[in-house]
Amino acid sequence: MTADPSPGPRSPRGGRSPRPDGPVSILICPACGTKNRIRPSPRGVPACANCKATLPWLVHATDATFDVEAAAQVSVVVDLWATWCAPCRFVAPILEDLAREHAGRLKVIKVDVDANPALAQRFQAFSIPTLVVMRDGGVVDRIVGALPRPQLAARLAPHLPPH
């Protein structure tokens, strides 16, 4: 991931204040444990600021940020979920694990359907969890319901770029 040459404004305490160009996701490096702030970006793959290891790419998106997040150059899994959904809670750690396992090849975008109804409608998420697999901006697969890890990994495997 390339560094942003614009450092942004300073806060009164001397640190950087939040930038107006989008929310920040915090990704924890599995290699060294460093917390990394990642902004929505259609280019590149996030790398740890400390050890430069490829980071697992799991972010939360909204109606406003989704298109930038989904424009990634890797396979994207859109997880349409809700806080009250028990099967969604079953799938969440599996997706986190797959994002770690396929760091640099897979981006998981979590969308809370209650907070982002336009995206739920756009992807026709009539049942949740609904997973939408995207490649190069287009939908290549849809998975409705909770699958165990082996079956979910098998469904995603053909859509992942080669190592």
Regions found by a protein language model. Give the residues of each.
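Cys/His-rich microdomains that often coordinate metals
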Residues: 36, 54-55, 92
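Thiol-based oxidoreductase modules, predominantly thioredoxin-like and allied folds used
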Residues: 61, 80, 92-118, 125-128
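Non-catalytic, surface beta->alpha helical segment in thiol-disulfide oxidoreductase systems
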Residues: 127-163
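A short beta-strand-turn-helix
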Residues: 59-76
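Short linker/helix segments within small regulatory modules
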Residues: 37-46
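Short cysteine-rich clusters marking metal-coordination/redox-active sites
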Residues: 29-32, 48-51
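Residues immediately within or flanking Cys/His clusters that coordinate Zn2+
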Residues: 26-27, 45, 82
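Short pre-active-site segment immediately N-terminal to redox-active cysteine/selenocysteine motifs
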Residues: 73-74, 81-84, 127
